[in-house]
Amino acid sequence: SGHHZBSTBZASZSSKPCCRZCACTKSIPPZCRCSZVRLNSCHSACKSCACTFSIPAZCFCGBIBBFCYKPCKSSHSBBBBWN
């Protein structure tokens, strides 16, 4: 199992940490939290992932960082997100 950190974007997009909904406090350093709900798992860099017991499970990441991850690229192009 070769694990390459510096893989290209062609690797699996879903394994890269990303977040569509992220909010930060105005403190210094900022406290940022991803509020995006994902099905069955959290993003790859999440340390404290919490999931519901439903099927499929709804998971969210409880980590607090001083930055936001880049928005996730979706499989279909939604250009509307950038307006």
From Swiss-Prot:
**Disulfide connectivity?**
18-72, 19-34, 22-68, 24-32, 42-49, 46-61, 51-59
Return the GO cellular component terms, semicolon-separated: extracellular region
Keywords in alphabetical order, please: Disulfide bond, Protease inhibitor, Serine protease inhibitor
User: Could you state a single Gene Ontology molecular function term?
Assistant: serine-type endopeptidase inhibitor activity
The family database entries (CDD domains) matched by this protein are listed as: BBI (cd00023)
Q: Domain of life, per the record?
A: Eukaryota
* InterPro entries, per the entry: Bowman-Birk_prot_inh (IPR035995), Prot_inh_BBI (IPR000877)
Where in the chain is the site Reactive bond for chymotrypsin? 53-54
Q: Give the protein family.
A: Belongs to the Bowman-Birk serine protease inhibitor family.
Q: What is the recorded name of this protein?
A: Bowman-Birk type seed trypsin and chymotrypsin inhibitor
Native organism is Vigna unguiculata (Cowpea)
